[in-house]
């Protein structure tokens, strides 16, 4: 749901760069909330106060301020390949779901987005697992020194398949995620009492946040089990910090419910929901600012600080067409005649 309408005035590389920079900044500024979410999902520390603020304060005092950003570098690094794979997969699925007349239903479009997200997650899954391991370790006594060292260590100690531990939950969790997306989308016109094509920018932002809250809440139990499976390792102190012992995904569900009740599957949801508005707010504003810079560079607007269009420029032209048109008129510009005596 967190997508922007394609602007033909940007090149493919510029769109990817804008999305990458926006994602990197939003991830970095909300990293402490992501840390609190993962810590609550993997293991509830007995005898300590719960909640995102208490968790962040405890990590800060024990490991220092820098520890609040554990795993964020890996999360940012995986953003670019993940976005590229997701975009390529989405285009393939759109072609697959498009009918003979070139139309695609809204349900098919949502399914294409969900499947593309699932493909990109599977392809880049080892980096997500490593991010979880880095978050769970104590940076004062680290088991892994970084992305490459973690990849090498896990591969040597636990085998290649350990890098994909819990990946099945990504596939299963896509079902409630897609259902939540469709549920929100089908009720948008009822919520705003108006057609979708007339929604304002604040309304679209609210739609994205609402969809994220619903879909993440529905799929959160699968995310919790996935995080526990990612973190669990006999080679790490305290089995990776996992608070229940299990032998597989189904057994993990069973042990969580047995030890903590059904609501234990939603441990960390508060921090996750608190992250939604600032995350998408930073992402949208950063993307729009980067987009303005690119539009100014391409010659469509007069300044990156405003959306004032350049007079005489056809906004329907693509960047390559606009460059060729400028080059054409530049070569056709008459040379000044020399004065004759």
From Swiss-Prot:
A GO CC term assigned to this protein in UniProt: mitochondrial inner membrane
SUPFAM superfamilies cross-referenced by the UniProt entry: Mitochondrial carrier
Membrane disposition: Multi-pass membrane protein
Record InterPro entries: Mit_carrier, Mitochondrial_sb/sol_carrier, Mt_carrier_dom_sf
Stretches forming Solcar repeats: 11-101, 105-185, 200-298
Places the protein is found: Mitochondrion inner membrane
GO terms, biological process: transmembrane transport
Main location: mitochondrion
Top-level taxon of the source organism: Eukaryota
Entry annotated with the keyword Isomerase: no
Record keywords: Membrane, Mitochondrion, Mitochondrion inner membrane, Repeat, Transmembrane, Transmembrane helix, Transport
Pfam families in the cross-refs: Mito_carr
Residues spanning the membrane: 16-36, 68-88, 110-130, 166-186, 205-225, 262-282
Entry's family note: Belongs to the mitochondrial carrier (TC 2.A.29) family.
UniProt name for this protein: Solute carrier family 25 member 43
Source organism of the structure: Homo sapiens (Human)
Gene, per the UniProt record: SLC25A43
